[in-house]
Curated annotation (Swiss-Prot):
Any one annotated GO CC term: eukaryotic 48S preinitiation complex
Sorted UniProt keywords: Cytoplasm, Initiation factor, Protein biosynthesis
Record-linked InterPro entries: eIF3f, EIF3F/CSN6-like_C, JAMM/MPN+_dom, MPN
GO terms of molecular function: metallopeptidase activity; translation initiation factor activity; translation initiation factor binding
Pfam families: JAB, MitMem_reg
Disordered: region residues: 308-345
Protein name: Eukaryotic translation initiation factor 3 subunit F
Length: 345
């Protein structure tokens, strides 16, 4: 990464600028987000078998003074490259850039990437296109990010900017001096957790990783911290016993880490932890009580509806029976009257 790069980077104005305009300063640092790097690696895996490298566009943000560039997202750009010429689908690049800028108005064009560490004449042509006026990054220099994706080797990333080279305009169009700039891959706690979950499936046969619950994740984190503390303790003991060479940088780092620890007594920590556990238990008890009351009220309401339906059907049956009895008595009276009339006759 940037700390291991064997060069000294000095910020300076780059390229010819218009009269009366402020000079543009080269970026002092390039920050790469993990999602952008994963997108580049995915593009490399999906390339054709006859392609040595693939290229694409880098999108991100730039600080107000231009000293730091953050690469947040990328998209692939089709190109055909031979030993004699290179063809890049510029129209597709312009349309995709317009769509990305509409979806993410805070991002801007910052440069381009290639999945090869080689810098040649074709790289200079593409670099001049991305750093040109109009659809390029002008007046800011375009960042060229190279990512080596050779199988069986570690992934190496390098960042460059360019300066114009050539006496004539025709010669300068296909020439550029690439200047390396410091860069780093920066990720937060969320990205780190995701990367650790993905890395856990590296040695598994099914190539899948199980996601842990919050309690399991907390337990694993505590175990990792305890392991780090044991390793640091063994190192300090070995330095004290003169079994290992002392490191001033490591000692300063450990001193700064210990200075961040809060000055709290163990008894206070235990008391606060117990109070927190009691609060959690109270909340859990109240939640279970509310759940039980809701279930009980639902059951009572269902029982009332069931009993009300049964009593209504019974009453309607009794009323129907009473109406039937009345109808029977009326029929008997009519029969008796008819028999009396026949006797009189």
């Amino acid at each position: 990464m940037a700390a291991a790069d064997p060069f000294l980077h000095l910020a300076r104005p780059l390229g010819p600028v218009a009269v009366g305009s402020a000079p543009t300063t080269a970026p002092l640092n390039v920050v790469i987000q993990p999602q952008a790097l994963f997108s580049i690696l995915d593009h490399s895996l999906r390339r054709n078998a006859d392609q040595e490298r693939v290229i694409g566009t880098l999108l991100g943000t730039r600080s107000e003074d231009g000293t730091e560039v953050e690469i947040r997202s990328t998209f692939a750009v089709g190109h055909t490259e031979t030993t004699d010429q290179v063809e890049v689908d510029m129209e597709y690049q312009k349309q995709m850039l317009a769509l990305h800028l509409k979806a993410n108005p805070k991002e801007v064009l910052v440069g381009w990437y290639a999945t090869s560490s080689e810098l040649n004449t074709f790289s200079a042509l593409i670099q001049n296109f991305y750093s040109g006026q109009g659809d390029g990054t002008f007046p800011h220099p375009a960042v060229h990010l190279t990512v080596s994706t050779e199988p069986g080797k570690d992934i190496e990333t390098r960042a460059y900017i360019s300066a114009p080279v050539g006496v004539t305009a025709e010669r300068a169009a296909d020439s550029a001096a690439f200047i390396p700039v410091p860069h780093e891959i920066r990720y937060g706690e969320t990205e780190k957790s995701g990367l650790e979950a993905i890395a856990a499936a590296r040695d598994a046969e099914e190539r899948a990783a199980n996601l842990f619950t919050d309690i399991e994740a907390l337990e694993r984190a505590i175990e990792e911290v305890l392991g780090m503390i044991d390793r640091v303790s063994r190192y300090v003991e070995s330095v004290i016993d003169e079994e290992a060479p002392a490191s001033t940088a490591l000692g300063q780092f450990l001193l700064n880490a210990l200075a961040l620890a809060p000055k709290v007594e163990p008894a206070d920590i235990e008391r606060d932890f117990n109070n927190h556990i009691q609060d959690v238990l109270v909340v859990s008890y109240l939640a279970n009580t509310i759940r039980t009351q809701m279930e009980l009220s639902n059951r009572l309401a269902t029982a009332q509806l069931t009993l009300g339906g049964e009593s209504g059907s019974t009453e309607s049956g009794q009323r129907g029976g009473q109406r039937g009895g009345k109808g029977g008595r009326g029929g008997q009276q009519r029969n008796q009257e008819r028999s009396g009339e026949e006797v009189r006759a």
